[in-house]
């Protein structure tokens, strides 16, 4: 009698390893084209280096060297100054999928699943047939270990082809070299250069060096020597737990009583809250957690929603901060205006998250193009699937006309704008394993929208101010053309010297007037008086600079003195009320008439040039 068909089918059924699955489905992880495969590999390696350096409190110094090998392949070398990897862990870190230290850690980090760099090793061996070379050293007195590894896709275990100790001049760090089928592209948004530029903006403490295939070297230098505040690991929050997960936790806990289990397994549950939860669920605080039935566990889960539990702690997050986002944008873009914000932390499904936004306007940015959106998750640039990201949806949902930007068709606005959006969380909800786009979680989208609107209001105030200043500028141009002619005619008629028209211009325009008066004594000494009068309607704050190649004496009030080689910058910080005035006096010794005539122009820092008469104005920072 023939065997039943079910028995024949059973003979063909077998388990597959995760490595085999991704071997046949590598596009899921971002290896679906030659350019993207290279970006994915670089991204995973750089993420690992940044995470390792920050955990060891080392300012990251990362080298990326890319070379073409033959017609279709490239060699990728990523070298860092991190803490290194202990010998026994090197093969597993690079040649075993789903092996890592962060999957169960509830804190903000770039990598989490333990797939990234090992997926690149798998792609390299599939397309180029070569092992991956790894060198790592954990200290100046420790040896450098050199491995060549591949992945056994049948078992998802590392295959070690070479294991040796070598001389390496670095005191500590890791170097990984892979050859793969990929292509290096330039001049487009999705490129290695743009990825590193974006990474440098949100990681201003890192120094990134790129050596391109043609030998060109690009350095993205650090903008700060201050390391990010390290994120702390937290316990899971009750609002983010699902039924099956709670059942598993109850089954395998070492706690003998339900109340202590709740207290020490979840964040923000103290003794009183644990007792309140048990009461709401109708459960005894003394009962053995592992004995709870499915129905009892469901009641416990429902009680989490009934009892008021504080939001999870936010020290598990490490936001960039408004100041460093500003510095990052300022370093990489030549623009006229920058505004930044870091929102207060929020929560979705028990996961804390924070949204940060920066907006840059003007300068050399293209006026007629769509705005440039730079998306980030846990300090990592998101270069692909922009249309499917919650960030993009939030941008498209805003009415940009009220903020001074055009929005043809009601979609993406146009204008000379770079918009940076960073979402940091213990669990960023990506739409796929390739981690290219953030899912449309209502809480996240709302926070992104609020943050964008906050910086956009600042941009709108700036744009309105520019319109006002333009009108003032046009008015002043007319006045400064007409008044000199009137003054000259009057002087000729009365046979007098041509008067200084600056006080008249300042009064008509409502400007800050700055005047220097010098009395030259017979002995060559000069008494200098600088008068400042505010003809405006608001309190004016600024810094007055007098940059001289001389030392001054008998000065009042005392300035801050900055030595500049053979010159001195004398700086007074001033506040002048409407219609108010202030004066600075000092003496200069042994001055000739020519030297007095050559005294440099005074500088006002902190005001627009349209608001100042009689001195050079620089915007600066007060």
UniProtKB/Swiss-Prot annotation:
Catalytic activity: ATP-dependent breakage, passage and rejoining of double-stranded DNA
Keywords from the named record: ATP-binding, DNA-binding, Isomerase, Nucleotide-binding, Topoisomerase
InterPro entries from the UniProt entry: HATPase_C_sf, Ribosomal_Su5_D2-typ_SF, Ribosomal_uS13-like_H2TH, Ribsml_uS5_D2-typ_fold_subgr, Top6b_C, TopoVI_B, TopoVI_B_transducer
Parts of the chain that traverse the membrane: none
Pfam families: HATPase_c, Top6b_C, Topo-VIb_trans
Molecular function GO labels: ATP binding; DNA binding; DNA topoisomerase type II (double strand cut, ATP-hydrolyzing) activity
GO biological process, one term: DNA topological change
Origin superkingdom: Archaea
Positions with a binding annotation for ATP: 48, 80, 101-102, 111-118, 435
Top enzyme class: isomerase
EC identifiers of the protein: 5.6.2.2
PANTHER family per the UniProt record, alphabetical: DNA TOPOISOMERASE 6 SUBUNIT B (PTHR48444:SF1)
Entry function: Relaxes both positive and negative superturns and exhibits a strong decatenase activity.
Family: Belongs to the TOP6B family.
Subunit structure: Homodimer. Heterotetramer of two Top6A and two Top6B chains.
Protein name as it appears in the record: Type 2 DNA topoisomerase 6 subunit B
């Amino acid at each position: 009698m023939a065997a039943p068909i079910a028995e024949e089918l059973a003979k063909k059924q077998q388990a597959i390893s995760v490595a085999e699955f991704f071997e046949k489905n590598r596009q899921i992880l971002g290896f679906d084209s030659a350019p993207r495969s290279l970006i994915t590999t670089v991204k995973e390696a750089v993420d690992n280096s940044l995470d390792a350096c920050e955990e060891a409190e080392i300012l990251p110094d990362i080298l990326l060297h890319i070379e073409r090998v033959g017609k279709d392949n490239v060699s990728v070398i990523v070298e860092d100054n991190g803490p290194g990897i202990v010998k026994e862990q090197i093969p597993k870190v690079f040649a075993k999928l789903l092996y890592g230290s962060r999957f169960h850690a509830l804190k903000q980090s770039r990598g989490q699943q333990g797939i990234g760099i090992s997926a690149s090793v798998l792609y390299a061996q599939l397309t180029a047939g070569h092992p991956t070379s790894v060198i790592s050293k954990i200290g100046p007195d420790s040896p450098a270990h050199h491995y060549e590894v591949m992945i056994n896709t049948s078992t998802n275990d590392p295959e070690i082809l070479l294991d040796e100790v070598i001389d390496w001049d670095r005191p500590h760090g890791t170097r990984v070299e892979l050859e793969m089928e990929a292509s290096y592209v330039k001049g487009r948004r999705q490129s290695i250069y743009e990825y590193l530029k974006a990474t440098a903006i949100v990681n201003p403490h890192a120094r990134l060096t790129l050596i391109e295939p043609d030998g060109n070297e690009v350095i993205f230098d650090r903008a700060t020597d201050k390391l990010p505040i390290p994120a702390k690991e937290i316990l899971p929050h009750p609002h983010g737990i699902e039924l099956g997960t709670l059942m598993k936790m109850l089954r395998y806990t070492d706690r003998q009583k339900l109340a202590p289990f709740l207290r020490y397994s979840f964040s923000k549950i103290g003794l009183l809250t644990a007792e309140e939860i048990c009461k709401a669920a109708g459960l005894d605080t003394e009962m053995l957690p592992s004995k709870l039935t499915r129905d009892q566990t469901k009641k416990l889960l429902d009680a989490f929603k009934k009892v008021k539990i504080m939001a999870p702690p936010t020290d598990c997050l490490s936001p960039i901060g408004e100041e460093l986002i500003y510095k990052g944008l300022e370093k990489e873009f030549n623009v006229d205006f920058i505004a930044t914000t870091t929102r207060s932390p929020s929560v979705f499904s028990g996961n804390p998250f924070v949204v940060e936004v920066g907006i840059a306007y003007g300068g050399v940015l293209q006026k007629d193009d769509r705005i440039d959106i730079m998306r980030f998750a846990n300090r990592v640039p998101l270069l692909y699937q922009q249309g499917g990201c919650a960030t993009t949806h939030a941008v498209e949902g805003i009415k940009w006309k009220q903020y001074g930007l055009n929005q043809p068709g009601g979609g993406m606005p146009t204008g000379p704008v770079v918009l940076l959006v960073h979402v940091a969380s213990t669990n960023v909800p990506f739409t796929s394993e390739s981690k290219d786009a953030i899912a449309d979680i209502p809480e996240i989208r709302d926070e992104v929208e609020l943050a964008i609107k906050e910086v956009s209001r600042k941009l709108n105030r700036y744009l309105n101010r520019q319109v006002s200043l333009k009108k003032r500028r046009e008015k002043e141009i007319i006045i400064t053309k007409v008044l000199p002619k009137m003054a000259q005619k009057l002087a000729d008629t009365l046979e007098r010297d041509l008067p200084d028209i600056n006080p008249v211009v300042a009064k008509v325009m409502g400007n800050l007037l700055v005047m220097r008066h010098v009395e030259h004594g017979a002995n060559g000494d000069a008494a200098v008086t600088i008068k400042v009068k505010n003809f405006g309607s608001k309190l004016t704050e600024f810094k007055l600079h007098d940059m001289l190649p001389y030392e001054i004496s008998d000065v009042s009030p005392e300035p801050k003195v900055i030595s500049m080689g053979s010159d001195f910058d004398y700086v007074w910080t001033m506040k002048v009320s409407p219609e108010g005035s202030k004066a600075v006096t000092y003496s200069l010794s042994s001055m000739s008439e020519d030297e007095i005539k050559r005294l440099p122009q005074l500088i006002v820092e902190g005001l627009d040039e349209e608001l100042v008469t009689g001195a050079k104005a620089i915007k600066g920072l007060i």
